Each structure stands twice: as structure tokens, then as C-alpha cells.
Amino acid sequence: LKDLKWRYEQGPTKTGRAKLGFMNATGCSSVYGSSFPFNPYPFPWSNHLFQDAPSVSLGLFEGHMRSMADGFKAIRMAEAELAGETNFGEAEESLRYFNWREFTDDELLLCPPVVAVGGDGAMYDIGFQNLSRVLMAGRPIKVLVLDTQVYSNTGGQACPSGFMGQVSDMAPYGPAWKGKNEVRKEISLIGAAHGTAFILQGNLANYTHMI
């Protein structure tokens, strides 16, 4: 318990426990956020391949919840001892397979969220299957999809999030390209169709959507 208290109040960084765990997909979100130590993130973050942010966030979540469960288990055992429970071994056995699904509401509020972030290529295209897997996983993981409607990281090519007839910096109108001839992939509708996640479609014009 002394170690747990130290980790929450100070930890290796002397700033206490992190408020969030951030898994970034290589791409536009990497460029917008710049590279360490010049990025603006005041919390631990990791950068992975274009398509892997949702999948890695699943592993990050499971590992983090295992660590949180160990802490909560120690607290529950201490509470049982303070309450004078005589069968300490039985109390310990009841927590043998204790996991995040058994956390109380108060315990869940103490768990920093895990957030996966990626742009059009990472979520609409090459990593679409990983995004779908996270939506179906039933884990309280947050995913932020940056809908720039082009492949921003590589200069602005047309991509699945663009609208019919789209022209862009790297796909200008000309003899060989008369505009995008595919309909837009509506990621919000596809996400809602999974039936397992809360979907919010926001806009930078109203930044309170993100708060």
C-alpha cells in the first residue's frame, strides 16, 4: 500500500499518476503533435504503425487494468483486515480472478482512460479492421478519428473519407482525374451499426464536443 500511495502521489515523474494513456497512429496525428520532446502531450503516449493504434490500445488497456486490479485488490484486502474479518484466506480466494469488470463505480473513476487517435488512413482505410475490432470488444476505450478528408500525412491525396467529386492537393482536377468517383465512407454510421459503442460526430467549429 505504501508503494501504491507513492505511485498515485508522486511516481517516477514526481507528478503523480497520469490522467490519460494515449496511443497514436503514425500519420497526420503524428505530424500535428510533432515529435518528442516538442509535442504538447502532458501524459504518457506511444506511437505505433499506421493501422495499429486501436489494437495496441486493447493491449494497453488490459495491462493497465491488470495493474489497477492489483492495487484495488490490496486495498480490499486491507479493508477486510481492518473490518476484522477472521477468514482472511477466504477473502483472498474470492479475489483470485478479480478483474476490471468487477470494479465498483468509484474504482472505475480512478482508472485513467485509454485513448486511441488516428486520421483517415489509420481509421478509415488501412486500420479499419482494427477499429472495428475495438468497437466490438466491449472495452471502455475511447477512439478519436481525425476526419481530414485527405491523407494529410503524405500531402493530401483523395481518400475514403472524401466526398464524391473531391479534388485535393495531390489529386488535382486534370485529364486523368476528374474528381473522386467513390462515395464517402460514413465512419460514424458504420460505428453505430456495430451496436456496441457510443458514437459522437463532432466538429472543431464547436470544440465543446471534445470536452
What are these regions (language model features)?
Residues Y173, W177, L200-N203:
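Residues at structural and domain junctions
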